[in-house]
Each structure stands twice: as structure tokens, then as C-alpha cells.
Amino acid sequence: MAQAGSASPLFAVVLAAGKGTRMKSNRAKVLHTLCGVPMVNYVIGAIRPLVPERLLVVVGHQAEQVRAVLPEDAEPVLQPEQRGTGDAVRVALEAIPEEEGVLLVVNGDGPLISDRTLGELLERHRSAGVGATVLVAELPDPSGLGRVREDAGVVRITEERDATEAERRNRLCNLGLYAFELPELRRAIREISSGAGRGELYLTDVLEIIGRRSRAVTYRLKDLEEANLVNDRSQLARAEEILRRRILDAHMKEGVTVRDPVSTHIEASVEIGRDTVILPGTFLRGRTRIGSDCVIGPSTDLVDTVVEDGATVEHSVGRGARVGRGAAVGPYAYLRPGTVLEEGSKVGAFCEVKNTRVGARSKVPHLSYVGDAEIGEDANLGAGTITANYDGAKKHRTVIEDGAFTGINTNLIAPVTIGQGAYLGAGSVVNKDIPPGKLAVGAPARVIRDAPGARSSSGDRRRARTEG
């Protein structure tokens, strides 16, 4: 056993092999997300600052799916049969050849645990010079957790299903985090493996065995909020609420205004610049990045979307889109993947835009579908402009050049190009290219004369044009 205060090598194991039957889910418990992050990755993130020599994750149920979400510095170790936490640690020990060191064992269903608490547990273990240390807390509602008794260096943990009525009245609970001296743990694991005589092997049994040889102690959790383990959907919601509040607090401390934290949901991966205002009912998810001085919401849902400085997005949905500096979106717009709005552009009420670039200062103000299109600068699409981009077999592109203007209820049958400065009359159905500077009307559209202001400079036309 290591001497008190010595810094022996640290190894870490996350137990993530269980099914989580109380979740009543087809998905392994540790794969359930909180604020966009799989539960198990919060635990790994708390361990990482301790800089272990190796960080192992024991996988079993849906092993491939769990492996797929693990970060690169986490080493998966397969538990072929889920025979309890004791067997999971035995499997992990087989992957650690070192004889000396400290093994930190953490359950994968505690997403609120902090690196600070893990560091304090480790410090308590090393300074006490004991064989094992377990994290405990006295909880107002200990339902579902093992009860802990400590007596003269021996720690006994009784699972709730095995506890007597008197033991259940004990509110000192095991939180599933341990520090072990490797030699002591290896010996104790062999004893429960050979003598337990039951289907599952409980890691908690090793504490009493180690305590009889070299003492085991407890460390009491200081922040009870971290004791929120996840075993069912209610506990999942409670833990996510706490994480969501932490995320919002962090953004507000960095200069972001959140008008209603109760109705605002921001995932851990989202970035927001200072002096941006987030209005009620807003969801920001995935790789979304919001610049400075933006207004987002109310009732807006953005996923993997970039919003540059000074832009506004209200009552709208964005998926894999980019909103340029000072651009305006909404209300009730839908930006689909591949949409790029350049500086000062606008996509207004009841518009859907997909795989389209909208040039600087161009406007799609209302009631339009624009898909697979390239819109130049200073163009204006009248209400009800539709790009018919799909012929039943292939998607085709529409090009609307700088300064072009479409009247209301215009249909553009792709592939088609509307030339620079061209005008389309209301109700036009365009199935052929329209030359620059011409006015076309009708169904099918035909050129009848020069567009209004065709002989003026483009700047004059831009100043004269009003939004449809």
C-alpha cells in the first residue's frame, strides 16, 4: 500500500457497461444526452483534469454505440457479460498491468460530478494512507442507493434491495465513486470472484474486505447537487435542468443577456458573443455559434448554425445555415442546410430557404420557397416567389443575378437564370433565361421591354427600389 501523501500513479475506470433498465429505453443509459452531450462524457470530462496515466471505460451493453461517442483519450474495455460492477472492475484490472498505483473508479451515470470533488476524494485517499476510499453523502431522499456504515476502518455498503428496514432509515449513501490501491483491490476482487456465489459481483463487497486488511474510509460530498445520479427519466430531467442552469450562468457571466432562463435551452457546445440577447423559448444546439450584438428569439431553434455579429433571428428554425453580419431572419422562417445569408440580407416571414446563397442586401421578404439557388447582391424577391427546383428525378439550380426583381407569385422553373437588373411581372412562370436589364411577364414569361430604370446606374436602381 502507498505511504500517506505519496503520489503514486493514477489510473481511472468509468463503469459504462450496464443497460439501465429503469430508464425503460432501447438505448444504453450512458448514451442518453444532457444538453447535447452523452452522459458518460460528462464523467470523462470530470476525470480528465486529474491527468490519469490511462482512462479506461468498461463497455458492455450496446458496446459499439458507446465506443462511438467516447473521446479519443478514453480506452474502451469490453465486459462480455454484464455480471455486476465487481466483474466490470475485474475486467478493467486485466487491462492494467501495473502492480502499484491508485485506481479511481467512477460510475458512468453521475453527469454532475466535478473534477474538484474527484480531486478532493483522491487527496483524502492519499493523505489517509488507506486501501480504499468511497464517496458518500447524507441525502434527504436516499431511495435506490446503497446505505453506508463506517466502523473502525471498515466500510460496509448494503444495497437497498438487500437492506433491512433499520438500514433503509440510514441516509448515508454510496455515490459509486471510489479510490483504491491497486494491490489491495486485486486481492479483494479475487475473493469476491471466488466466494460470492451469486449472479452479480458487487464492487461494494471489496470495501469490507479491504477494510479488514488495511482500512477503508469515506469522503463526504460537499456539494449535494453533484449527488444527482441518473437511473430513470425523472432523474435525467432533473440533472439536465441543473446542467442547463450552469451553462446559462456561464454565458451570462460572459456578457450574454438571457431574458428567461427557465424557457431557454442552450447546449454545452454552443458559443455566444457578448451583448447578444437571447429571448424566451430559444433552443441553441449542436455546433451553433452566435456572434456579438445579436438578438435571437423568441421561439427560435438553431442547430449547427452560425449567426454573425449584429444579426437577428426571430421565431425561426435554422439547420446547418449561416446568417451573415447584420442579416435579419423571420419571423417564421426555415433555413435548411447549405443556406448562406450574406451581410445585410433578409429572409422574412413564412419563407423556406435550402442550399442557397442570398447575396449582400438581397431580400426574400415573405411567403417564398427558395431551394438550390444563387441570389446575387441587391436583389428582391416578391411575395410568393417559388423556385421549382425538382423535376421528379434531379435537383436543378436557379440563378438570380445582382439587382434582379421578381414580382409576387412568380414561379422559376429550374434550371433558369434571371439576368442582372431584370424584372419579372407578377404571376410570371419563368422556364427560360431572362436577359439582363429586361422585363418579362406572363405564363410562360416573355420579354416585353427593358426593365424599369435599365438605363440608370445600378446604384440609382437600388435606391429607387422598394421592398415588395
UniProtKB/Swiss-Prot annotation:
GO biological process, one term: cell wall organization
Alphabetized UniProt keyword annotations: Acyltransferase, Cell shape, Cell wall biogenesis/degradation, Cytoplasm, Magnesium, Metal-binding, Multifunctional enzyme, Nucleotidyltransferase, Peptidoglycan synthesis, Repeat, Transferase
Enzyme active site: H366 (proton acceptor)
Localisation per UniProt entry: Cytoplasm
Pfam families documented for this protein: Hexapep, NTP_transf_3
UniProt region (Linker), positions on chain: 234-254
Entry-linked InterPro entries: Bifunctional_GlmU (IPR005882), GlmU-like (IPR050065), GlmU_C_LbH (IPR038009), Hexapep (IPR001451), MobA-like_NTP_Trfase (IPR025877), Nucleotide-diphossugar_trans (IPR029044), Trimer_LpxA-like_sf (IPR011004)
Binding-site residues for acetyl-CoA, renumbered to this chain: A383, N389, Y390, A426
Entry's cofactor comment: Binds 1 Mg(2+) ion per subunit.
Main localization category: cytoplasm
Documented EC number(s): 2.7.7.23, 2.3.1.157
Catalyzed reactions per annotation: alpha-D-glucosamine 1-phosphate + acetyl-CoA = N-acetyl-alpha-D-glucosamine 1-phosphate + CoA + H(+); N-acetyl-alpha-D-glucosamine 1-phosphate + UTP + H(+) = UDP-N-acetyl-alpha-D-glucosamine + diphosphate
Gene3D superfamilies, per the entry: Hexapeptide repeat proteins, Spore Coat Polysaccharide Biosynthesis Protein SpsA, Chain A
Binding residues annotated for UDP-N-acetyl-alpha-D-glucosamine, in chain numbering: 15-18, 29, 79, 84-85, 146, 159, 174, 231, 336, 354, 369, 380
HAMAP family in UniProt: GlmU
Protein name: Bifunctional protein GlmU
